[in-house]
């Protein structure tokens, strides 16, 4: 997933990038390794304990990031004001795309959980959008195979905001209305969903 995220965000020299739900930090590290000339990568997570794993992983690899404990739904103004060229939102989800590795999900997950996740995911997009510069791009990622957490969330968000949906094509998976769905594979590959949004410059 980290490889695909870096390909889709395509970080450029001098850019400020926000990893909004960053723990444990694998995707942030991959972005920093892909583009060592970023102006800044800000790694943000609501959990201080989980955020420490981001610090540990970046330090272990000799990488530099700005680490901030914050809820992506209500970012502090000092994060929002300079704006970001790109934002990664790898949001909390039902994890239905990784049931092969976590079979308990099939038993424990309830319908009400899916609705609550979808509400949280939409709130995260709402919270992040003001921090994205005009012309910037936001990559929405889940490890869910449920439309309620994927296309439905993006469509609901696009009804409320001026959004350009950018095309995604990968070597495997299925094109959806506003994103790309990778299904779990027999070889152990996880189920993932990606949607790439751009904020119009006008």
Which sequence ranges carry the predicted segments?
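S-adenosylmethionine
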Residues: 1-202
